[in-house]
């Protein structure tokens, strides 16, 4: 789902337009499984998907179809009802689903089948933990999967193997509590921590640079809880924190803060 600060900018042309727009509310009375919606995605067939605290929902423009744990579809079902994130695969007809405590799920919406990836102590190539906070497309077509307790996973879709990037494998990484990442497409991974600021990881050699808020430096990170990181079409890196929005300049390694004029909420998240 696009970050709220991006929606703010996208809504400006709508607000300036004279065209009337109708807003429809879609809640449990319309068939949504739960009103606490944590993530939204649109698939390649045009359907909207809503992840909630109580199941997965597909909306066809008229009605909702719900997907719950223990509902078997062609052999398997979704592994948990408490969800955190969705990603429509950039290449394949797959909806990726991150759960709070039940691993990573892949839903093939053409063939109506689920595949799941859970932590397995006996398999070091399995996902390192079942608590998934975000799923992001990697520059090479694979996936980055962030977790709340065990760092970042790189998922090779062809082999089904996970490669672990955490404080045990990346010396100097600020923490293993990760909200999100963005693939810079330049061999660098931009990382948002739960409490420990912002990091830049050189994927090949695993060198890392960490950035935290400095109250004496107006060009530092606004806040240390980084909920969203976004690379725009001009390769700018936008960072959403608990204390406002910032634009990161990779050349100077400074942040331009957008948190003082009252136009944006200080808490930026996706």
Regions found by a protein language model. Give the residues of each.
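Carboxylate-rich, polar loop motifs that coordinate divalent cations or form catalytic acidic clusters
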Residues: 1-270
């Amino acid at each position: 789902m696009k970050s709220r600060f991006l929606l703010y900018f996208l809504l400006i042309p709508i607000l300036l337009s004279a065209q009337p727009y109708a807003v429809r509310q879609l809640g449990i009375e319309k068939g949504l499984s739960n009103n606490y919606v944590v993530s939204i995605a649109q698939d390649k067939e045009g359907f909207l998907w809503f992840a909630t605290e109580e199941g997965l929902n597909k909306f066809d423009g008229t009605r909702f179809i719900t997907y719950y744990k223990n509902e078997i579809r062609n052999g398997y079902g979704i592994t948990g009802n408490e969800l955190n994130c969705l990603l429509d695969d950039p290449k394949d007809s797959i909806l990726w689903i991150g759960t709070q405590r039940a691993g990573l799920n892949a839903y093939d919406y053409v063939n109506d089948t689920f595949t799941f990836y859970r932590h397995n102590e006996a398999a070091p190539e399995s996902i390192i933990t079942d608590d998934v906070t975000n799923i992001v497309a990697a520059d090479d077509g694979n996936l980055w999967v962030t977790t709340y307790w065990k760092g970042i996973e790189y998922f090779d879709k062809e082999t089904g193997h996970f490669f672990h990037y955490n404080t045990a494998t990346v010396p100097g990484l600020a923490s293993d509590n990760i909200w999100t990442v963005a693939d810079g497409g330049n061999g660098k991974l931009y990382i948002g921590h739960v409490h420990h600021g912002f990091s830049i990881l050189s994927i090949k050699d695993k060198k890392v640079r960490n950035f935290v808020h400095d109250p004496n430096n107006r060009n530092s990170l606004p806040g240390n809880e980084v909920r969203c990181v976004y690379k725009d079409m001009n390769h700018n890196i936008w960072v959403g924190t608990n204390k406002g929005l910032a634009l990161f300049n990779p050349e100077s390694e400074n942040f331009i803060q957008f948190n003082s004029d009252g136009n944006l909420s200080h808490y930026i998240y996706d």
